[in-house]
Amino acid sequence: MASNILQIPFRRSHTVSLSTALTQYISTKYDQRPDMFADDLLIIDRLRNEAINVQEPHVSGISRLVTYAAQLKWLGGKFPVDVGVEFPWYPAFGFNTSRPVSQDNIRFELANVIFNLAALYSQLAFAVNRTTTDGLKQACNYFCQAAGILAHLRTDIVPDMRSAPPEDMDEMTLRSLEELLLAQAQECFWQKAVMDGLKDASIARLAGQVSDFYGDACDHAVKSNAISPEWIHHMTAKQHHFAAAAQYRQSLDCLEKRKYGEEVARLRDAVACVNEALKESRWINRTVLGDLQGLKNRVTEDLKRAEKDNDMIYLNPVPPKSELKLIDRACMVAAKAPSQVTDAISMLGEKGPLGQPLFSKLVPYAVHIAASIYSDRRDRLVNERIIGELENMTDKLRDLLSSLNLPGSLQALEKPLGLPPSLVAHAEEMRQQDGLNRLRKSLLDIAKVKSNDRAVYTEGVELLAAEKAEDDASRRKFGTDRWTREASEAAAPKLYTTAREIDGYFTSAQSSDNLVEQKLHDSEAVFRVLTGTNRDLEAFVPSSRRATIPPEVEREVSRLRSCISEVNRLESRRKRKAQAVKDKARADDISSALVREAARLEREFPMQAIQASQFEDLFESRLRDYDVDLDMVAQEMHDQDQIVAQVRDANRAFTRAHTGDASTKEREKALQELENGYLKYKEIISNIEVGRKFYNDLAKIVGRFRDDVKAFVHKRRMEASQLEQDISSVAAMASLNISPIRQPPQQTVVSAPVSVSAAASVPAPTHFNPVKPQPQPPSQAIPPQSQPQPQPQPLRTPLTAPQPTRSVPQVTPGMWSPEMGIRFGPGGTTAQQSQQTWDPSKGMKFS
């Protein structure tokens, strides 16, 4: 059946076994058996089947949809979004509604259910009897709730889907549908105002707001790939229709206030708006077209009458459209989602209106997040304060040996010819690893990861800067008295702090990267020798003449060799201890402790979503198990100090006892340079691995930062839009003047449906008792208003529209005024003149 309003169609789905996927996930990811939740698994499938079968506009469908949606929100705290089942849903809009879109995403399922809830409310409004004031109130309320549900879907659910929304759930489509629903809600309020007989000026303001809503809906619809052209034509026609209705009602107000020139101007604009709307006549239904034709007929008739009166009687100048004051808006509707949608989880419980939460005994998903957080902290403790410290001490020990030319000085003395076996082994290791090329390739890979991290971070920072600029511009535009929300940095201090911290990470990391590249550049020549052949090594290391070692030198050599062997044993022992700590951390499973703590929290704080931050005390307790390893690091540092002192003493004694010739010194220098080169190679590899891990971890941080910024900016822009609307509404309501008028007893209550065209017209004039004879205008004789000045009343009070009248002022006898009209005839007394008025139907006669 054709109608002058639209209803949102349902999205359709078919049956899938959600319980099967949940069973599989519980059995593989949790420490609990799926059969413990057999009843819950049956219930969740039943709830889904009931929800997807809501395809008719009946109020019973509301409870089915909100109950299933609440359970889906609850499951979001127990399971990840990709639980393992493809949810198929057929689009409600677009050019391919016969092919379903499927996603393994609980949030996608929730979005479709919430969309259908909004569609249900819109269809309930469509089905309401809108010929009565009660029906109009109910329809208006349904439309507002449908718009609120779509706003909740757009701002709270779709951004958390972690996947691209369907084509008919994108930003522009949802915004268009929201504005359309608000337009139809405002239209219901406007229609009720007409039925209640409000003042023409008030009805004009209401109609103007209806036109604005339809205009916004159309603007967003043309940017959507899903809204059909028929709907766009409908919105366009309604936008111009209500612009015409607003001007028509304002013209009636001008007529009442004797602004005859402005009346003509507004009627002309109303005709122009109607003609603009009629350009869509090929694509709109007969009901909308009939309303337009009825309005056009009414406006055209009034325009002819007004132009004739003004041209022949009043002679008021007709202002151009540009000089007409814009009609104030009166927005009487707002998007408001039901509490069962916005506060669904709080309504789940043993006695909650939405039933008992399912899978309440299942370990919450937040527990797994907490386990991940603990693992990160434990690994940071182990890697930085234990393993990292041990490696730093070892590096310092190697630096000491290198500064003392050890073991090169001993090797040059003990083996004056050929290559030491340790050097040959080191060179072979580097050749097998393709040492120099490996280092260069690793640095290039790290540079790519760093570039990606920087791009993601820059995107987040630019979004923050853009939002701050928008907020500052709005604050300058509206002033701090009206733009009362927090400044950007005050609204999101953590985001700005995180941005500065990440920038600091990049700065410090760049210094480290430059240092590693400098190390590679300085040691590149030695690396080429070490990765070459043994002949290259022999050519690099000069031989020295064989000499007899004196006993005193032999004694110092033996002592120094013993110290170096102790250093090697210390390094080996450290590697074993570091590996033991790594194994300990790998076996450190906090899951069971988290489950016990989660059960305690659920008992003490029922219906409160468990957050990972609630496990802080448990984290601290478990990390204290590594205090013994921290003590071991301190002991290792003490032992190293002693060994370093012994090495220094032994080397000083060896240096005093051993002088050596020039060839020995050259061989000693070459061997030490190669030994240092190998150690530098191992050091650079370690640095590269640290850098690789750093930038990979930083990728997660900057990605999370960018996502948080996107969510914050989206929320702030929604707040700004709402605040601007509130400011505009306050200004419009301040100028809104609505008051009750006494209705003559002859007027009857309208019982027939009020169409758009009929509602835009003026109620028929009532009968009046004549006053004393007086010159009348050429239209109809209407006495001046005698009612007292009405007082403003709330909008909910039924009102009647005043009859459009022209007040007739007292006229001085013998003096012409525009209200007297044009009269021809012989002169006479004032009394005679008052009875001889001109009849337009008789033409002009001269005597």
UniProtKB/Swiss-Prot annotation:
GO BP field: cellular response to pH; penicillin biosynthetic process; positive regulation of penicillin biosynthetic process; regulation of secondary metabolite biosynthetic process
Keyword Transmembrane: no
Limits of the BRO1 domain: 4-397
Database matches in Pfam families: ALIX_LYPXL_bnd (PF13949), BRO1 (PF03097)
Keyword Coiled coil attached: yes
Listed InterPro entries: ALIX_V_dom, BRO1_dom, BRO1_sf
Entries under CDD domains matching the protein: BRO1_ScRim20-like, V_AnPalA_UmRIM20_like
SMART domains: BRO1
Entries under Gene3D superfamilies matching the protein: alix/aip1 in complex with the ypdl late domain (1.20.120.560), alix/aip1 like domains (1.25.40.280)
Bias (Polar residues): 829-839
Coiled-coil blocks: 256-312
Region Disordered: start-end pairs: 763-847
UniProt feature, compositional bias: Pro residues: 772-795
Domain of life: Eukaryota
UniProt entry keywords in alphabetical sequence: Coiled coil
GO cellular component, one term: endosome
Function description: Required for the proteolytic cleavage of the transcription factor pacC in response to alkaline ambient pH. May act as a scaffold protein that recruits the calpain-like protease palB via vps32 to its substrate pacC.
Family assignment from sequence similarity: Belongs to the palA/RIM20 family.
Assembly: Interacts with pacC by binding to its two YPX[LI] motifs.
UniProt-recorded name of the protein: pH-response regulator protein palA/RIM20
